[in-house]
Regions:
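An amphipathic, basic-hydrophobic helix/alpha-beta surface used to engage anionic
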Residues: 13-272
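Feature marks short, highly hydrophobic, charge-poor N-terminal signal-anchor/signal peptide-like helices
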Residues: 1-7
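Exposed, interaction-prone extracellular/peripheral surfaces
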Residues: 159, 187-371
Length: 371
């Protein structure tokens, strides 16, 4: 009789635990998705973390972290990953149990082969009952994205043209005077304009004196990108422009040339929602500078660009390049070179380099003719 009573108590306890664990399996459980770096190179692993934490006072005998990936995300390993039956994606799923206050961190590596912006789906946290028969899930809040910048453009003609442009930029450093930096004073000559006389120094000295300007101490440039995908079925010209722009900026970084970057492109919906009204409908740009952080901003802009322009090429060049600044200019564009030169019009002696996708076509034709 006592054995029967004990068995009944055991069954009642199991049923009670089963009911409690079914209802409260996700109580005090938090899940979060983390991306090690949202800027990832094409073809390189992008590591993401699925973290589950038990902040409650009770053990959690069964927990799982689940993330669905679209077909653009290519897993680097098949561990804990199953392919959808439709073939349109993959599902990452990790299972564990947690003590009170314990946290589990699961990581997986993905690859993205094409330039662009990719949004990760929200992570799901799954809790199970005491007997492992019933599961309930919860979708965690949060927004995560991966930005893939374009690959560099491997064109010998591009490297040759950039080499000539950078050489001319270095020469101009010692040709043009900087109207801001004063190197000293010298006697006034008949060829100097009256406005250049330094009256304060003239009173102290032995006659009229004028300021002696220093030469430009830092080479500067402006990089403008106008890539218009007029034919949606053939985005290759715009993609090539983005690749050439990356190569241009990398060469400027190597030569420690301070540059300002602007891309005439519509950007993703995240930026559209973050900015009110029509203010978002303008090109993104970086301030004058160079260095790792500056270059990283350039790569992110190139990765986010959609290939759809906001301004006409002429208006874009007019608003983002000012000849009076006497800054060298590089324009990467799908427009004809003649139209760009007519829109930019730098002052005499200021270098202007126009790069178009036709360079690649000419290179391919030259290679075929040589073969």
């Amino acid at each position: 009789m006592s054995a029967v009573i004990f068995a009944l108590l055991l069954v009642a306890t199991a049923l009670g635990l089963e009911r409690y664990s079914t209802v409260h399996s996700l109580d005090d459980v938090q899940g979060r998705l983390e991306v090690e770096d949202h800027l990832v190179e094409a073809g390189e692993p992008a590591v993401i973390h699925l973290v589950v934490r038990n902040s409650g006072p009770r053990w959690k005998m069964f927990l799982a972290a689940k993330l669905h990936l679209n077909k653009e995300f290519l897993p680097c390993a098949e561990h804990h990953i199953t392919q959808d039956q439709t073939g349109w994606g993959h599902t990452v799923r990790f299972t564990t149990w947690l003590r009170p206050g314990q946290e589990a961190d699961f990581s997986t590596a993905l690859r993205l082969e094409r330039r662009g912006r990719y949004v990760l789906e929200p992570m799901q946290v799954i809790g199970g009952d005491f007997l492992g028969l019933v599961e309930q899930s919860r979708t965690e809040r949060g927004f995560h994205e991966l930005i893939v910048p374009p690959r560099e453009c491997a064109l010998p003609e591009l490297e040759e043209m950039l080499g000539g442009f950078l050489g001319e930029l270095s020469v101009n450093r010692y040709v043009y005077e900087d109207p801001i930096l004063t190197a000293g004073y010298r006697p006034y000559t008949s060829g100097d304009p009256m406005r250049s006389i330094a009256w304060k120094q003239s009173v102290r000295g032995q006659g009229l004196m004028v300021k002696k300007w220093d030469y430009t101490t830092e080479p500067r440039a402006v990089v403008l990108v106008h890539a218009d995908t007029k034919d949606y079925d053939h985005p290759e010209p715009a993609e090539l422009c983005y690749s050439m722009a990356r190569t241009v900026c990398r060469r400027l970084e190597e030569r420690a040339v301070s540059y300002r970057f602007a891309a005439n492109a519509a950007f993703d919906l995240l930026l559209n929602a973050a900015l009110s009204g029509e203010e978002w409908r303008k090109p993104l740009e970086t301030p004058q500078g160079y260095g790792p952080e500056h270059y990283r901003k350039v790569l992110e802009i190139l990765g986010r660009a959609t290939g759809q322009t906001v301004l006409s090429c002429a208006r874009f060049c007019a608003e983002y390049y000012h000849p009076q600044e006497q800054v060298s200019c590089i324009v990467v564009t799908t427009e004809p070179e003649e139209a760009v030169r007519a829109a930019v019009r730098p002052l005499p002696g200021i270098p202007l380099l126009v790069l178009t996708p036709e360079m690649a076509a000419e290179t391919a034709q030259t290679g075929e003719a040589g073969a």
